[in-house]
């Protein structure tokens, strides 16, 4: 690891790995909080390469890039790095499980994987001041999941934006709108954001489980959503709501229709959004279409459904109808991007050139989806269900 906390620019050059070595590897550099432009030159004089690049906690930055022996390709992207620090008297109240995440440490970490990762050089420099940052607020369906086989759309959407946009994912498993606020996570967002940045909020999964005086969709939940709106707009930011992803809960009679499990929470979010003129991405509707299109059995392919002993220390089958696997998260991220396009958000002009519009009624073939598992594995279900 290099210490470059007062970084202006640093560049690493590598000797190509041995021709027979295709193992994934990591590189980290100690930097201050902020956005960093990373430029990688992929390829090797010694071998053909197939390289996937991820950042921090499994954020997908580049899908597999193929290079012939002696061929080199250059790509740039923005990585957002943060720590729990807000002020000398205030920090984000992270959970014990988060303390091991790359998300909150003092380093910017890059992961190089794929069938044959090949890297010539990496350059890390502060991103231009005008870089637009999109801050994500939410729960386990949004968070940068640290371990396989779980994944969320927040760590996949990074793949679709070029070096003009940073994604800063502050979501965490098990959070409600209220606990997000109480743990100072919005305070951290506000401390990092500038005028014109975006804050995207998806809540509702865990909020419905709150059982105390004043809880409920139309009172406490709605009140907390209004807090997000007021604080973000006070700083000159743009706020967007995302209705919660559906759970895989089919009707018992025909196993063909998704049944509603979120009560009034999606409608409450829509009502607050309408009253306060907040744009809404209808992920609730798109994921319903997605699950119903895949069908009762194939929809399991998008979630953490795996037979016993698929992974080490997994004696029982995994049957999670809430949390996505990498394929499902990749598809949901495309739905969010389509929601941005439908809202005509200015940042969609920065989508990468290989973006193709997506229809959840015509999902990508899960049999064709390729994912190289990261080294961190934990089959323990994330907080929230």
Feature locations, PLM:
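Solvent-exposed loop/turn segments at secondary-structure junctions
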Residues: 44-46, 140-144, 172-178, 205-209, ...
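Conserved catalytic region of serine esterases and O-acyltransferases that act on ester linkages
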Residues: 70-72, 91-93, 102, 148, ...
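Short, solvent-exposed loop/turn and secondary-structure capping segments
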Residues: 121, 145-149, 180-181, 211-215, ...
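Conserved SGNH/GDSL esterase-like catalytic core that processes O-acyl groups on lipids
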Residues: 104, 115-117, 127-135, 141-231, ...
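Short, electropositive alpha-helical surface patch
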Residues: 189-192, 252-268, 297-306
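Substrate-gating cap/lid alpha-helix
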Residues: 249-287
């Amino acid at each position: 690891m290099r210490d470059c906390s007062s970084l202006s620019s640093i560049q690493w050059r590598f000797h190509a790995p041995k021709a027979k070595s295709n193992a994934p590897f990591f590189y980290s550099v100690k930097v201050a909080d902020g956005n960093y432009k990373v430029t990688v030159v992929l390829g090797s004089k010694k071998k053909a390469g197939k390289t996937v690049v991820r950042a921090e906690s499994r954020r997908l930055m580049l899908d597999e890039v193929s290079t012939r022996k002696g061929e080199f390709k250059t790509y740039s992207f923005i990585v957002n790095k943060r720590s729990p620090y807000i002020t000398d008297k205030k920090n984000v109240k992270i959970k014990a499980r988060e303390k091991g995440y790359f998300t909150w440490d003092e380093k910017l970490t890059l992961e190089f994987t794929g069938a044959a990762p090949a890297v010539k050089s990496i350059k890390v420099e502060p991103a231009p001041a005008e870089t637009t940052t999109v801050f994500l607020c939410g729960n386990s369906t949004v968070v940068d999941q640290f371990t396989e086989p779980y994944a969320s759309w927040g760590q996949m959407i990074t793949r679709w934006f070029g070096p003009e946009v940073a994604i800063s994912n502050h979501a965490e498993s098990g959070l409600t709108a209220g606990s997000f606020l109480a743990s100072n996570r919005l305070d951290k967002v506000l401390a990092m954001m500038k005028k014109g940045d975006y804050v995207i909020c998806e809540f509702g999964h865990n909020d419905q489980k709150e059982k105390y005086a004043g809880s409920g969709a139309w009172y406490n939940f709605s009140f907390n959503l209004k807090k997000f709106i007021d604080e973000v707009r006070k700083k000159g930011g743009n706020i967007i709501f995302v209705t919660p992803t559906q759970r895989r809960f089919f009707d018992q009679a025909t196993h063909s229709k998704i049944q509603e499990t979120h009560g009034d929470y999606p409608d409450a979010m829509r009502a607050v959004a309408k009253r306060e003129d907040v744009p809404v991405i209808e992920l609730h509707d798109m994921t319903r279409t997605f699950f119903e299109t895949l069908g009762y059995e194939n929809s399991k392919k998008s979630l953490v459904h795996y037979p016993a002993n698929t992974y080490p220390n997994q004696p029982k089958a995994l049957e999670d109808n809430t949390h996505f696997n990498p394929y499902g998260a990749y598809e949901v991220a495309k739905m969010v991007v389509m929601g941005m396009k439908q809202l005509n958000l200015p940042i969609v002009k920065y989508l990468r050139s290989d973006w193709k519009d997506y229809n959840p009624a015509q999902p990508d073939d899960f049999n064709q989806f390729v994912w190289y598992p990261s080294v961190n594995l934990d089959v323990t279900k994330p907080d929230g269900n």
